[in-house]
Amino acid sequence: MVRASLIWLNYNSLGFIDIALRSIGSALRLDFDDYEVVIVDNASGDGSFERIRKFVEEKRPSSVRVKFVRSDANRGYAGGMNLGWEAKDPETKYVAFLNNDLIVEPNSLRELIDYMESDDKLAAVSGLVYLGNSKRIYSAGDYVTDHWIAGGVCGNGLEHECPGISKPHYVTYAEGAYMLVNAEIVRRAYPGGKPFIDETFLYLDDALLGLILWNKGYKTAYIPIKSGYHYANLTTKPVMNYYGLRANTALIMLLDTRFSWIKPFYLFRRDLGYKVLCLFRDEYCRAHRSFLDGYNLAQILRSKIGFKLDLHKAPYVKIGYLDFILFDFMMLNRIHYKSSIITHEMLTNPQSI
């Protein structure tokens, strides 16, 4: 039995192999005595898996147990992490999930576990993640608004722009690029006893985990420790627009908020808008395909979850009715969210832990 398992996911990382090797190298050198690293490769075809395996075999400390899992297909974040979940030590108490473009701080796993030990209802946590090698923040935990926008708390801000960042806070969900979960709680609370639903593939997975945990009576939190540096979207950049819109459409359909009464019109407007714009530009045809795939994904997820997700059972960002009209129906949403920083104080019930 090990106390913690770290699942590290790779897919076609040859184009940024230096960062991927730094990432797995940091995962092998954590200041923690009792853990294993499960390396999952999502059927990479660019030779990156072979480079990574050679690096690990040469650099692995003798005290760290390593398992390699090679998928027969690209299963995305959700399916790949689930493969690692199935391969981990079945008795492990905590499981960390780590992207191949994130370099972890040596003390982070131990410090995250120390916080989790203090509350038996704490199911998932993440720390302070910086954007690449800059001083800008990628995530201090993650939020969902009541008009179905998700993102990183303090995202793209600097520490002095984020009051409360030095204290732990409950958040809507933990950051999936590097988060820690209580394995037993996930087995009890999540459909199929696994941390993710395979069909989500990419995006939505960490948000769905947090929302389900809150709806089941558990908690997710941001812990104020420097946990890592994320060179974001190096793997997903070619498909992020498609999967991002797909995930957002599914989230709208699945998640009940105080704006749920307007969902039918909201979705109809999107559907019609993409159809009309598709007549003029191909990119909107692709967007419409993504929208329809998100609609179908929501049907699958709803049947697997088995109950309605209520945002009000989690901390969330409350949007005013005027803001909802301006930012969504007058198409100002993208401009607003690129220019604003969501802080912990903006979440409902922003109490420290």
Positions of predicted regions on the chain:
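A conserved acidic beta->alpha catalytic loop
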Residues: 15, 23, 41-52, 73
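Short, acidic, metal-binding catalytic loop of nucleotide-sugar glycosyltransferases
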Residues: 23-34
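Catalytic donor-sugar/metal-binding loop of nucleotide-sugar-dependent glycosyltransferases
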Residues: 192-201, 207-228
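Acidic donor-binding/catalytic loop of UDP-sugar-dependent glycosyltransferases
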Residues: 47, 102-115
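Acidic/His-rich active-site region of diverse nucleotide-sugar glycosyltransferases
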Residues: 70, 79, 110-195, 199, ...
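Active-site-adjacent helix/loop segment of glycosyltransferases
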Residues: 7, 219-303, 307-320
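Glycine-rich, basic loop-to-helix element that forms the pyrophosphate-binding segment
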Residues: 70-88
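Short beta-strand-to-loop acidic/aromatic patch adjacent to the donor-nucleotide binding site
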Residues: 91-103
